[in-house]
Amino acid sequence: MSIDIPKLNDFNEYWLLVKNEVIKKLNSELNLWDDACKFSHSKFHQLIKKLDLLGEWPTTPMGKLKTNKETFELFDDYYPEIKKLKRIFNLLNASKLTEFAISEDARYRPYGGYKPFGTHTGRCTPSSKWIFGTAKWARSFIKPPFGCAMVNLDFKSQETFIAAVISGDEKMLASYKSGDFYMNTAILAGMAPTDATKETHPEIRKIWKTIVLATNYGQGARGMAKALKKFNKTYSEVAGLLMKYKEIYKTYFDWAEAKSNHAQVHGYISTSLGWDRHFPYAVPINPRSLMNWPVQSEAGEILRNALIRLLNANIKVCATVHDSFLIECQLPELNEQIRIAKQCMIDAGTYIVGAEGMQVDVEIHRGNFKPEPADQELFNLIFEEIEKYKTSQKLNQGQVTYPNKVRSI
């Protein structure tokens, strides 16, 4: 894919020189680092206490609160403060991020970083050598060449559609077709009126979104209760909501349990096209690891089938990213190529699961790739500091500078 080479070169040249200034700006709300960018464990302890997480936060053998990536990832989806904290730690450790392999034609080709079929579900293995596997703000280095646009085509709530169709759960399929699965589930649970929307009942929707996504990954009520504590939900209340969720979509959960039982008895589980997962004889199997396997694996089958269709239709595919494709289109052909690409993806879904109705979202990037707003803000902040540094050096005419070179991100 095409990369913004001037911006990449600026980052490589000036990042180490502006890193502390970026950290200070990000720290203005958290106030956990001093002017020398030294971390305060006592202030961090106060923050975790304020968030009411002291009883759940993992500690080191010496009794200190852990500050590693894995610990932050337990809480960052539910606490904005932890997400920002994780982002700062990532930047502090980034004297050198993963290398971009830039070819002679100034395009990025991830030799060794892109690993299809790397997981037991047949999905790609995440890798920091792959631009979509490293820091999300770095995606802003992706830039279409002159006269082109980059288009991200994403299967909308793909796993919900697959689960509804292959399990035969009509209620789940109706919720998917409503356009807002989380809100419709809240309505079915009696927690929102029939005319409720994302705008009128945002908190209720967030609660059910958390329950749905956590259940997809085999999480129980205790884990969900941690995430829903900020909505003043107790463990007992969350357990009740989880039970209600399983009652609403009873057909799906009965089917998923039957698939899990079959795998444990026979020692294997398969997709419709024959991607298998086999289990060693007489070795205990974690049932939770099987609950979402059929859905995830069928999603992988759809993605691969869609990729074949896109390439046969002469669509320029730059990347596959979980449930989406990044394609490059010439501007005069943009709308037509998007139409063809969407149809290829929809046809792939129909072919694999045997039912129509899969939806595809489209994002068009005519300039640099736009990640989530928080990640875009971070990218902008980094380059604001780089521009300030470059301007200050121009004003200091007699001063010689020796920029720290960083080979890549």
Task: State where each predicted segment sits.
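Conserved catalytic palm subdomain of right-hand nucleotidyl-transferase polymerases, strongest
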Residues: 144-159, 215-220, 224
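Catalytic palm active-site di-aspartate
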Residues: 1-5, 152-155, 223-224, 317-330
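Conserved catalytic core of nucleic-acid polymerases
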Residues: 111-112, 116, 189-316, 320, ...
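Short, contiguous acidic/charged loop-to-helix segments that flank catalytic cores in large enzymes
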Residues: 74, 97-105, 137-142, 152, ...
